[in-house]
Amino acid sequence: MKKTLSLFIALLAAIAVSAQDVSIEFITPRIVHIVKGKPTKSLVVTAQKQDVPLVKKPGSISSSELTVRLNEKTGCVTFLTRKGKLLLREKSHDVSKVQQTFTLDKGEAVYGLGTFQNGKMNRRGEKKRMEQSNLEDFQSVLQSIKGWGLYWENYSPTVFEDNADGMSFTSEAGEGIDYYFMWGGSADGVIAQMRQLTGDVPMFPLWTYGFWQSKERYKSSRELLAVVDKYRELQVPLDGIIQDWQYWGSNYLWNAMDFLTEDFSNGRRMIDEVHRKNAHFMISIWASFGPMTQQFRELDAKGLLLPIETWPQSGLTFWPPRMEYPSGVKVYDAFSSEARDIYWKYLKRLYSYGTDAWWMDSTDPDFFNPRESDYTHPVTGGTWRSLRNAFPLATVRGVYEAQRKEADNKKRVFIMTRSSFAGQQHYGSNMWSGDVASSWDMLRKQVPAGLSFSLTGNPNFNTDIGGFFCGSYNTMGGGSAPRNPQYQELFVRWMQYGLFCPVFRSHGADAPREIWQFGKKGEPVYDAIEKQIRLRYRFIPYLYSTAWQVTTNNASYLRPLFSDFASDAAVWDMTDEFMFGSSILAAPVLEAQYTKEQIIREDAMTGWDKKEVKAESPQGAIDWSAQKSVKKYLPKGAEWYDFWTGARYKGGQWLTITTQLDRVPMFVRAGSILPFAPEMQYVGEKDWSSLELRVYPGADASFTLYEDEGDGYNYEKGICSEIPMTWNDRSRTLTIGGRKGQFPGMLSQRTFTVILPDGKSQTVSYSGEEVRCKM
């Protein structure tokens, strides 16, 4: 039975809709598709419409979860729960525009839309023109503290505005209003609905949860390999090494997708060496090509290049750019399946060398000095304007789908991308927040930016640890920022935020960022950095098990506090604390405590005023051992343990916490089980035959330890294992349940050491059968 209502059969009651068609279609009992005019040809939606039982009455239609009403005079739609609770309603609008206005409750908080770099969570009172860029990425997905979500299905630049007249979306192109309303009941519930609509999240390789080192850029294979060697010599953990741009040589050969300089004379051998050192290799690729590349010539001959001005603008590699020598670099039409096939045909060469992961830079793409003729230029399926914001989705999807089709593919696709659009979580990508400035203000902005991004349904977010542009700290000469105490403190605190991101990656320009640039072992800054890296590796069983929950149960890594504590209004706009998975409350220090923080300007390309920074540079040694303090909030509805001290606190209170340089404040929710791995130099150096299980009493708890082969897609066939664990708080008993499933290389025997916050511990042997541990 068709579930679409239109002007012609509207609710079987001949409702007039002011000369416009209104289509109301239930995709699932909790997802409703609204169209006025012509629908968008979707690049995002993957869900198949379910056969949803409906109850129709004059002026309304209901599923088991939602009721939708249609005003017969105005054509406006209202959404309610099946029990009649008002969720959201439309207002009348100008039918000559691709625009819809909605009425929100007074004080109703709304979230999402992507990575706004304004330091806010709640979107009330904001006006923003949403067009993909380096620093801000937009997914037209919004959700409310009331538990509903909305996906605006339009790919053109769109203005979001909330004011006294209502909340509206106004798009620059389109033939109709097209959006999906979702009822989730909570933040996690809305995310689950969005993924049901646009696709689930595939697993990433286990090794990607280790530490990554990068910089702009390693200038030879010798330099890159020496970095891996140095980490191994220092016995500091490392899993990923990244080669940034220009390994191809001239800008006229931009993105040739091959090693074309003497400094990278044998790319395959270099990658083999990385693998022999038990590390993995990621390489930078772009969505544009220089005029001397094979890709440019083939795409140009087929009319599959765009005329927009992009990076690099100069054909010379000098800085600043010499514009009298234009590069001729052009962006490819990623909306064309033929163009995407050509892209992979040449990228496959790097894949054949053994590349483990892709760094898809400038997937926005860079778009300078835009002209009206650029926006009206035809691309496959529309115009540049009509499809503009979906470009990152199209190019990332092309690489993901092509690699998945490779017959010998034993590697999970891992793509790091600078931009993202709705539904991109389905295509093996993790988005970083762009070329952010190295400042405390920008660090503070990354927390709400990452949370807002996660609320759109894509859980995979990271940042350039330390910020990309740190040149203002080079007060003692070129590349000296890591010796500047102001930058040292910022870098350590950024590392502590990065500890909680799905990808833990140090990168940037203006100065190298390897750990030894900041000092040597035994010195406070070096030791603080090393401590964060080592802690990350201990967290990996928790992280990887969370990844499984992300894939199978629509969980998230970075979760705003209102995800679990929506009844506590104090956390509705919390921008400096968040949940890391389901159990850990991360409360990183986001202000300078040992050095001065005077911000002169916030321009992402220049950062701080260099003269002022030099004047502010501390004179004399910094006492990094001094204890400081910071105020943090513990939400109502749970009790909390200080991760470091084991002290227990009630929720609903502000605490003044003693801090030190090498510790990031964090708390564990009472009623949690956390698995900890042994220390290791790289993922896989040691197996998980001996794990710690830290149990935090105060409530019943459950956790599922997930394991598989660590790479490849056999998990999609059920080749993996789960070990369920439960804590009964009344009996103080931990039950480690019988293992479910198996995979090649699975451990047959292991030990778990159960540890309580008061230090009591007990070690148990486990061979796959249920065991109980009474504490």
Where do the language-model regions lie?
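N-terminal accessory segment at the very beginning of proteins
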Residues: 1, 18-208, 214-216, 220-229, ...
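Sec-dependent signal peptide recognition
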Residues: 2-10
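Hydrophobic h-region of N-terminal signal peptides that target proteins for export
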Residues: 10-18
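Beta-sheet entry/capping signal
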Residues: 21, 31, 67, 140-141, ...
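Short, solvent-exposed loop/turn segments at the edges of secondary structure
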Residues: 72-74, 134-136, 145, 174-176, ...
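Aromatic- and carboxylate-enriched substrate-binding clefts and catalytic-loop regions
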Residues: 89, 239-529, 564-566, 574
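Short, acidic/polar
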Residues: 220-233, 340-348
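Catalytic core of carbohydrate-active enzymes
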Residues: 401-405, 413, 420-431, 453-463, ...
